Amino acid sequence: SVPPVLVGASLGGIAGMIAQGEYAKAGRRGFAALVLVDITPQMNMEGVQKILGFMASNLEEGFASLEEAADTISRYMPGRPRPKNLSGLAKNLRLRENGRYYWHWDPRFITGTQKPQGSREPERLQMAARSLKIPTLLVRGRDSDLVTVEAARQFAEIVPHSEFIDVANAGHMVAGDKNDIFTSAVLDFLTRMAPAASTS
C-alpha cells in the first residue's frame, strides 16, 4: 500500500511529528511526506496561551448567534476580514437544543486535567523532528503568535532537508487566512516530492 502524506496544522502537526518519530524508532516507514502548518518543536508560550484563551472563550455560555461568534473571532484576529457569509463558521459550531451555538471541540480538551500545554514534552518533539528523514515542508504564517522566525530557523537546522514557506498576511490559521497561497504551496510541494516519496 502507498503510505499517506500527512498535512498537520497546530496540534495535528505535533501528532504527525510524534507519530513519524515513533515509526522511525520502530524502523518503519511511516508517512510518505509531512507538511507542518505553523507548528515546530519550539513554540512561543505567549502565543500558546493566547490561542488557549481564545479556545476557552465562551466555552460554557456559547453564543447567541453566528454573528456573535464572528464578532469574537474578529476581536481575536483583527487583521482577518469578517466574512459576510457565515456558513463556513457554522461548521465549527454546534447548535444545541437551547438555541445557542458552541465550539465543536470537547470542553475537556481545554478544562480537563490533560489540557494541552505548549511546553509538554519538548524533548520528545525535538527528538521526533531530528528523526524526520521524509520530505518535510514547514508552512508558517508570517504574523503567527506561535512560531517565531527563530523557531523556524531552528527547525531548519534540525531538519536540514526540509522546505520552508513564510506566508505573508497570515497568522496561526494559515489555511484560513490565505487559503489560495497555502493550497498552492502544498500542492507544489507534493507534486515535486512525489518521486522522492515513492522511493524513500
Show where each model-derived region lies.
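Conserved serine/cysteine hydrolase catalytic core
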Residues: 95-157, 163-166
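Internal catalytic or translocation cores that form aromatic/hydrophobic pockets or channels
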Residues: 36-78
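Conserved hydrolase catalytic core segment
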Residues: 1-47
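Catalytic histidine-centered segment of alpha/beta-hydrolase-like enzymes
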Residues: 167-183
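C-terminal alpha-helix
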Residues: 185-196
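Short aromatic-enriched loop/helix-cap "lid" or pocket-rim segments at secondary-structure transitions
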Residues: 45-50, 150-151, 177
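Conserved alpha/beta-hydrolase catalytic His-Asp/Glu region
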Residues: 62-120
